[in-house]
Amino acid sequence: MSSTVIDRARPAGHRAPHRGSGFTGTLGLLRLYLRRDRVSLPLWVLLLSVPLATVYIASVETVYPDRSARAAAAAAIMASPAQRALYGPVYNDSLGAVGIWKAGMFHTLIAVAVILTVIRHTRADEESGRAELIDSTVVGRYANLTGALLLSFGASIATGAIGALGLLATDVAPAGSVAFGVALAASGMVFTAVAAVAAQLSPSARFTRAVAFAVLGTAFALRAIGDAGSGTLSWCSPLGWSLQVRPYAGERWWVLLLSLATAAVLTVLAYRLRAGRDVGAGLIAERPGAGTAGPMLSEPFGLAWRLNRGSLLLWTVGLCLYGLVMGSVVHGIGDQLGDNTAVRDIVTRMGGTGALEQAFLALAFTMIGMVAAAFAVSLTLRLHQEETGLRAETLLAGAVSRTHWLASHLAMALAGSAVATLISGVAAGLAYGMTVGDVGGKLPTVVGTAAVQLPAVWLLSAVTVGLFGLAPRFTPVAWGVLVGFIALYLLGSLAGFPQMLLNLEPFAHIPRVGGGDFTAVPLLWLLAIDAALITLGAMAFRRRDVRC
């Protein structure tokens, strides 16, 4: 039997797409990412660079006008394990060293920024199907990853360069200015690579963010514990390496090699892992689901719990560890600061009034509250992700009402952030109480200090719900609102912003616990604003179309 082979000629002018190398299309994707981030990218680059000279150095020149005042401040800082745990050590009494001491937190903030940026353009795009659509064009296997890396590496370098240039324009040593800028850029590059590796592990962007932030939280804890003690553990943390460069204190340039080598190794690992998986897949395989849904999944609240329980566990553990660190180092801070009234005034002003230990606890839990607010925003944004991922439409087409569906995710956000915050308060209270031998006396005060943060934490969830109902396309702007609040808190008083602007920051209205003059009025106002925004967002969601 003979067979006929039909050779179908291609239509004239038709060519099969030629992908070229694995990096084909990288520059085009980079331009796309720059366009998508044309607001957020310049914002965080400038926020993490410009204040170094205009706020930190300028404020130290005003508060500590001579070397003797700076020497007293530096001695007080180094005598306080709590201060070293929060911001790192200060290595001498020069204007540069004392001036950038609190900017040590910028190494953590740039890590947060690059993690969110990399995951937004890699795993989040794959999860939404955008990456698959792009890959249907002439784009190489590694173009997406390379574009995201170039974007974050470039932004990190720009942040360090702008910060260094600003410092060079002041009266501090040029070598220290360059060292701080390079160290800041190196921190961003390390965690850019961390996020790139995490993006290869799971099909879920939420899991990817959880892994990357778990690494960052571990790095921060190691750095904080190390700097509060002998300093040995700080060498196990990339955040510690950046501080060990010691700008303005006999710069140790060789330490930068640790960060650059780590970034290089992790970047190579990310490419190797990317080569071994398909678009949309992860190296950690998802467990197959059960044949039938359990009773919990038959209603929206159970589904919301199932979707978010992993995030709740990770964030709670992270805040609990931070609470343990803060609770264990707070005792004796008043004695350790000695008679330096300037430093006492700064710590008291940023944390409230009264005893310095209570003021430091208020400061520490304000930081915890801001982290919990980020967790609340993350959980509330699940509404937006479910809608844009077309999963909400399926649920709402059945017997589930819009109000019930929204309430399930909102309840998870409010309860989850409350649980994480209160457990961190319990951990800090136990550590503090055992240190002073008075658990029964200290635990209620510390837990109360944690609890009063909740109305401000919930405000960020309320803002997210309001945006989701009224302007769903702009729901992720809730992250920008949180960044604005944090910037006002960290920079507002130092930069001399008007009080009217400072009053917009919700954490500035948290009353002090344990001093005898507690007032609940600010908390009631915050709760009223929370309720109003949530009601407004829910009513708007009931009346608008579900986005497809």
Swiss-Prot record:
Q: What is its main location?
A: membrane
Q: List the disulfide bonds.
A: none
Would you tell me the Gene Ontology cellular component terms? plasma membrane
| One record GO biological process | response to antibiotic
Q: Transmembrane residues, as ranges?
A: 39-59, 99-119, 148-168, 178-198, 210-230, 253-273, 313-333, 359-379, 410-430, 450-470, 477-497, 521-541
Q: What induces it?
A: Transcriptionally regulated by RaaS (Rv1219c). Expression increases in multidrug-resistant clinical strains (MDR-TB) compared to drug-susceptible strains.
Q: What is the topology of this protein in the membrane according to its UniProt annotation?
A: Multi-pass membrane protein
Q: Where in the cell is it found?
A: Cell inner membrane
Keywords (A to Z) from UniProt: Antibiotic resistance, Cell inner membrane, Cell membrane, Membrane, Transmembrane, Transmembrane helix
What interactions and quaternary structure are annotated? Answer: The complex is probably composed of two ATP-binding proteins (Rv1218c) and a transmembrane protein (Rv1217c).
Give the protein's function.
Probably part of the ABC transporter complex Rv1217c-Rv1218c involved in the resistance to a wide range of structurally unrelated drugs. Probably responsible for the translocation of the substrate across the membrane.
Can you say what this protein is called?
A: Multidrug efflux system permease protein Rv1217c
